[in-house]
Amino acid sequence: MGNPRSPLDRRLRFRNVPFLPPRIAASSTTTARSLKAKTMEMRFTIAWMWFPSVLLILGLLTPPSNGCTVDVGRNVSIREQCRLRNGATFSKGDIEGNFSGPVVVELDYEDIDITGERQRLRFHLSGLGCPTKENIRKDNESDVNGGIRWALYIQTGDAKYGIRNQHLSIRLMYPGEKNTQQLLGSDFSCERHRRPSTPLGKNAEVPPATRTSSTYGVLSAFVVWIGSGLNIIWWTGIVLLAADALGLGERWLRLALSHRDKHHASRTAALQCQRDMLLRQRRRARRLHAVSEGKLQEEKKRQSALVWNVEARPFPSTHQLIVLPPPVASAPPAVPSQPPEYSSVFPPV
């Protein structure tokens, strides 16, 4: 049926367009059904796209509370669990017991980065002995009485090609010498694409062998980074959010561009509708008048169209004509039927 408030509705043909109120003549063509559809679309967008996407972005911006876990190895006890502090990872523990010979410590370090990807580092520490005075005298023996406190320190460098470069250092602190800290290099075996380097300072140059971006190119690193299941979920939400934001931006831009011509377009549509209706009324009147004409009307039209000096009968009038009395016979006619003689008008000289 259409929208009765629309100026283009076919039911307006039978209305008096010049006397239509302006709010009806210039109203939009939005129906109640389309408004309901837009409302449902907005609810669907908020429920299934915006809300999960906002949660995913908040999850990306919020760092994990426990960034890593340390699994104990042989004769190792964890005193303090791994945590994040100022962008660096710390883990502390104690090696307890009485040891004869070199100490072997095996630790599994598992890192959860900000993108939710898990990376496990397995490193092997061997030959750890307490450098007491007795052990210094003995070249081939190392006895540990009491304990050795160890600390794991991992600092994350700048991201390159989607791979984080980490610097790992081990610190050993002995009970007898509390103010002494010794940095030890170790034999590391790293799974996946992370290769921790030897202890480095802040401004130290990273050796080429420890650069993670040298082995993997841009494409392979991107595939490895996106390949995680959790990353796929996050990126799906981000893509949906971007698509919805683009659609909403396009709708707002189109509305802003068409806002200027909205009044002009509605007025033009109303005037065009009025013109069409007037033309239809004229055609309808002509058609009805042509059908009602008979032979008598055609004869009258033909006689009225003749030359002026030919006598024609006038159209009948609704008003009664005033009938004058006939002229007296003795009186000369007011207008002679014959032209006068020449001699009577101009007498001869």
From Swiss-Prot:
The membrane-spanning stretches of this chain are: 221-241
Record's bilayer topology term: Single-pass membrane protein
Q: Where is the composition biased (Pro residues)?
A: 328-339
Q: Where is this region: Disordered?
A: 328-349
InterPro entries attached to this UniProt entry: US30
- The principal localisation class reads host cell
Supply the alphabetized keyword list: Host membrane, Membrane, Transmembrane, Transmembrane helix
Localization (cell): Host membrane
Q: What is the protein name stated in its UniProt record?
A: Uncharacterized protein US30
Source taxonomy: Viruses, Duplodnaviria, Heunggongvirae, Peploviricota, Herviviricetes
